[in-house]
Amino acid sequence: MRVWLASLFLCALVANSEGGSELEASDESNCGCQNGGVCVSYKYFSSIRRCSCPKKFKGEHCEIDTSKTCYHGNGQSYRGKANTDTKGRPCLAWNSPAVLQQTYNAHRSDALSLGLGKHNYCRNPDNQRRPWCYVQIGLKQFVQECMVQDCSLSKKPSSTVDQQGFQCGQKALRPRFKIVGGEFTVVENQPWFAAIYLKNKGGSPPSFKCGGSLISPCWVASATHCFVNQPKKEEYVVYLGQSKRNSYNPGEMKFEVEQLILHEDFSDETLAFHNDIALLKIRTSTGQCAQPSRTIQTICLPPRFGDAPFGSDCEITGFGQESATDYFYPKDLKMSVVKIISHEQCKQPHYYGSEINYKMLCAADPEWKTDSCSGDSGGPLICNIDGRPTLSGIVSWGSGCAEKNKPGVYTRVSYFLNWIQSHIGEENGLAF
């Protein structure tokens, strides 16, 4: 009872002090107030000091800026309240037991200067690309970039290109246009690669369906033949930043398909697929489009009717089978190099004859040892045009895999630029 009365008396004194009886402490260093906060003590308890924060700031030291909804630069000075990663998963508090085992936590001697404290707000204490936090995934804690916007992107874009901070065709790793044959790779080599999965019932993991390419922050280009038998957008989920299929990849983003557009003149009545192009509009569960990162980037579109010269080396990427006799798709992303073949050669009778038209591109390994195969459908054919990686083709069809005189056939993207723009619109972030 005495304890309760004492507590009540203390609360009354504190309440009274809030009404105007607070006194400024003579030594503000004892509080460590930031952002214009004033160190104050109570009239009857002068040894108890705290920070009185200006409007818009809160926290023990007024270190949290409640008005900040975006970050500047790389966000090292960000002190806002974003507290989820790019997939909407909650951040761990910097003073939580799990985080205390990590390098950056609230118990560091420099925690206050780094923005760390008794909260779970996103920070960038180690000068990374953007604000991040620790997220619990299974039994482990992972560093995850946060769902918070770059302030420079909140301004109205000056053009239709690069409106989300992307730089099309830019890789985190050095370009690899000289490899011979296929090899397993990481998505940093093809950061525009999109993995499209078909949802399964009963809670089982989704099944890999096709590849695609991120052509703007909200749009993925793929092949119509991937979806004609199951055209409902709700049946698909799209991942960016995946190096391993059906596995968690740090930095990956998951999207629902908001809109699925199949080409109205698609035809598969013969061996060939005609007008084999599709567009998927993607959004996260929180309504976000793709965010640029080391593993996620857009790919440049080609000039109108501008294609790589015949004989050019181009890259193909996917989770497709390594041969026509394989039953399972590989777990790791694979990249190969093929050469563009002329229409005249590809239309030869011992190639594909009259099945080839001007809306298609042919490409193959001169040794016929590597090729796109089942499971690579919809994925990118990336060629160097005017010094930058460009989406020249979309994996469409072919006879077998790496068969002699049977090159892979790709949708010629430069022919379909008007179709793409007519469906996406002008303010789209496309880069040509």
UniProtKB/Swiss-Prot annotation:
An annotated Gene Ontology molecular function: peptidase activity
Domain annotation EGF-like: ranges: 27-63
Known regulation of activity: Inhibited by SERPINA5. Inhibited by SERPINE1.
Main location as per UniProt: secreted
Region (Connecting peptide): 152-178
Subcellular location: Secreted
Disulphide linkage map: C31-C39, C33-C51, C53-C62, C70-C151, C91-C133, C122-C146, C168-C300, C210-C226, C218-C289, C314-C383, C346-C362, C373-C401
Signal peptide: 1-19
Gene3D superfamilies: Laminin, Plasminogen Kringle 4, Trypsin-like serine proteases
Residue span, Kringle domain: 70-151
Region ranges (Binds urokinase plasminogen activator surface receptor): 34-57
CDD domains listed in its UniProt record: KR (cd00108), Tryp_SPc (cd00190)
Catalytic machinery residues: H225, D276, S377
One GO biological process term: plasminogen activation
Location of Phosphoserine modifications: S158
Reported modifications of this chain: Produced as an inactive single-chain protein (pro-uPA or sc-uPA), is processed into the active disulfide-linked two-chain form of PLAU/uPA by a proteolytic event mediated, at least, by TMPRSS4.
EC number(s) reported in the record: 3.4.21.73
Cellular component, GO annotation: cell surface; extracellular space; protein complex involved in cell-matrix adhesion; serine protease inhibitor complex; serine-type endopeptidase complex
UniProt key word Signal: yes
Keyword Hydrolase appears in the UniProt entry: yes
Keywords, alphabetical: Disulfide bond, EGF-like domain, Hydrolase, Kringle, Phosphoprotein, Plasminogen activation, Protease, Secreted, Serine protease, Signal, Zymogen
PANTHER family, per database record: TRYPSIN-RELATED, UROKINASE-TYPE PLASMINOGEN ACTIVATOR
Assembly and interaction partners: Found in high and low molecular mass forms. Each consists of two chains, A and B. The high molecular mass form contains a long chain A which is cleaved to yield a short chain A. Forms heterodimer with SERPINA5. Binds LRP1B; binding is followed by internalization and degradation. Interacts with MRC2. Interacts with PLAUR. In complex with SERPINE1, interacts with PLAUR/uPAR. Interacts with SORL1 and LRP1, either alone or in complex with SERPINE1; these interactions are abolished in the presence of LRPAP1/RAP. The ternary complex composed of PLAUR-PLAU-PAI1 also interacts with SORLA.
Job of this protein: Specifically cleaves the zymogen plasminogen to form the active enzyme plasmin.
Protein name, as recorded: Urokinase-type plasminogen activator
Species name: Rattus norvegicus (Rat)
